[in-house]
């Protein structure tokens, strides 16, 4: 329930009023380096990328920046009316209800990996953070 409320608030703040997603002095903010790691649990493929995001910016912005600057990275998303921006596919691979697969969002900071509690439209990566996009299943193994 709390996750739904947080996501709804982020969605409401971002879409109608794009300026609310950034601080008032965002013109003075610098670009900070971040990493994006794409992991496919089924093929054991791991791809690593470097990009930047505006300080206090969003994961969505970092992924767009990476897509704009790398021929090897593509992502797609949908906008859910209740839950906001939803990561749909990475490099042409999409989650599937039939196959019980999805893209799990993780963060690695100082060697500690945690699951994100918000989506790409709300999460604010920090300098030198590794954002992990993990293609996995919710089915019991």
Roles of regions detected by a PLM:
Residues 2-141:
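Ubiquitin-like/PB1-type beta-grasp interaction modules and other compact soluble beta-rich domains
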